[in-house]
């Protein structure tokens, strides 16, 4: 079976840095054998992070900034690929492909007036291809959207390859900046794989931490442990329109970013900062549980919930999730419990998607994104001859 060595590159909505997974993949399709060789996260320097944050702001962004940042990030992504190869003592010349998600600048999954559904990820693939002398596959979301999908979530295809079990029905819950869930029926089942965003992950928690505590995030949920849940704030959060929508659906910074947090802090400024952080942590947990109870558990018998992403390291958030699901008779694990990496999960996913595109295989899941059909994802950029 043909073997490919691929670097999956992911820069998510949390802006933690650039995640890079060096992966060995044997074959293609659902029978692929995937092995993680090495994973690293390369932090953004403060200047780049500041420019990304400015580019994400409708009020402060401009086309000149986005144009320049597109090339700067391409260089950052190329350097991150070189770094993962260096750490793994792996020759860059051996690398067959790079799958680059890019940095999402704006994602509009549904029509809004005269604005049609669209998405924009930057991090120029030509720069990556030139700097690494390696073929790059990028812009994975656009073809799904061209086919009528929301362009998200895209990880379900990789999750079926990695996590489908002969007898257990599993929920894969990713808690990154945004939270998304994939329902993976067992190998004997004729039920569909479904997936959708459940709302905020770390996004609101991190933004509140930065504004109220001058910290990038709540490490291990230690601050949230000290406060109490304020029902008035929780009710306000849980009334968000996104929670009332039916899947397939996706969301992002546009709904749960700076604007949401500014309004929340203005409205509830009389409450202690610890209580506010505890409550928005509970909001993330409750929004996940809400979607399970409304859209999944009435239709699927779930044996295991497997948590991944940076939020799985927040023990307060995980405990809130356990309490919310204590009556549902399903075991809850984090990725590390079953031999995988919570941090590397999405970067591995884009290595797998790059492999599928290389083999001309469709790799969106229409039941997850709402696309009219399965499509081959991504644009291919070749290195200089």
From Swiss-Prot:
Gene Ontology terms: biological process: 1,6-anhydro-N-acetyl-beta-muramic acid catabolic process; amino sugar metabolic process; peptidoglycan turnover
Residues that coordinate or bind ATP: 12-19
EC number annotated for this UniProt entry: 2.7.1.170
Keywords associated with the record: ATP-binding, Carbohydrate metabolism, Kinase, Nucleotide-binding, Transferase
Position of the signal peptide: none
One annotated GO molecular function: ATP binding
KW Chaperone (keyword) present: no
Catalysed reactions, as listed in the record: 1,6-anhydro-N-acetyl-beta-muramate + ATP + H2O = N-acetyl-D-muramate 6-phosphate + ADP + H(+)
SUPFAM superfamilies to which the protein is assigned, alphabetical: Actin-like ATPase domain
Pathway this chain belongs to: Amino-sugar metabolism; 1,6-anhydro-N-acetylmuramate degradation; Cell wall biogenesis; peptidoglycan recycling
Transmembrane segments: none
Matches recorded under Pfam families: AnmK
Sequence similarity: Belongs to the anhydro-N-acetylmuramic acid kinase family.
Entry function: Catalyzes the specific phosphorylation of 1,6-anhydro-N-acetylmuramic acid (anhMurNAc) with the simultaneous cleavage of the 1,6-anhydro ring, generating MurNAc-6-P. Is required for the utilization of anhMurNAc either imported from the medium or derived from its own cell wall murein, and thus plays a role in cell wall recycling.
HAMAP family assigned to the protein according to its UniProt record, in alphabetical order: AnhMurNAc_kinase (MF_01270)
Protein name: Anhydro-N-acetylmuramic acid kinase
Organism (species): Bacillus thuringiensis (strain Al Hakam)
């Amino acid at each position: 079976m043909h073997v490919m060595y691929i670097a999956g590159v992911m820069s998510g909505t949390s802006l933690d840095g650039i995640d890079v997974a060096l992966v060995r993949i044997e074959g293609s399709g659902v029978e692929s054998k995937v092995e993680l060789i090495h994973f690293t996260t390369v932090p953004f320097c403060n200047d780049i992070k500041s420019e990304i944050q400015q580019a994400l702001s409708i009020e402060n962004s401009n086309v000149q900034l986005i144009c320049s940042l597109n090339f700067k990030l391409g260089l950052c992504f190329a350097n991150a690929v070189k770094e993962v190869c260096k750490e793994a003592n792996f020759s860059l010349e051996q690398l067959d492909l790079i799958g680059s998600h890019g940095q999402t600048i704006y994602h509009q999954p549904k029509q809004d007036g005269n604005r049609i559904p669209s998405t924009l990820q930057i991090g120029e693939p030509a720069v990556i291809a030139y700097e690494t002398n390696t073929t790059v596959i990028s812009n994975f979301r656009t073809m799904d959207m061209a086919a009528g999908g929301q362009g998200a979530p895209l990880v379900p295809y990789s999750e079926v390859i990695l996590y489908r079990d002969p007898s257990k029905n599993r929920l894969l819950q990713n808690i990154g900046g945004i939270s998304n869930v994939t329902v993976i029926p067992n190998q004997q089942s004729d039920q569909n794989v479904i997936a959708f965003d459940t709302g905020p992950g770390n996004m609101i928690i991190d933004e509140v931490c930065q504004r109220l505590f001058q910290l990038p995030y709540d490490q291990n949920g230690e601050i949230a442990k000290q406060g109490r849940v304020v029902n008035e704030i929780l009710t306000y959060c849980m009334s968000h329109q996104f929670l009332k929508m039916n899947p397939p659906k996706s969301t992002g910074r546009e709904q749960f970013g700076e604007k949401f947090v500014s309004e929340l802090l203005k409205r509830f400024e009389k409450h202690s900062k610890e209580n506010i952080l505890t409550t928005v942590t509970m909001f993330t947990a409750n929004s996940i549980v809400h979607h399970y109870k409304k859209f999944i558990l009435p239709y699927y018998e779930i044996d295991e919930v497997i948590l991944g992403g940076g939020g799985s390291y927040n023990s307060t958030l995980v405990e809130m999730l356990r309490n919310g699901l204590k009556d549902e008779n399903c075991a809850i694990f984090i990725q590390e419990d079953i031999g995988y990496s919570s941090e590397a999960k999405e970067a591995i996913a884009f290595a797998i998607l790059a492999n599928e595109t290389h083999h001309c295989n469709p790799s969106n899941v229409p039941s997850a994104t709402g696309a009219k059909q399965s499509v081959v994802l991504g644009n291919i950029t070749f290195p200089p001859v």
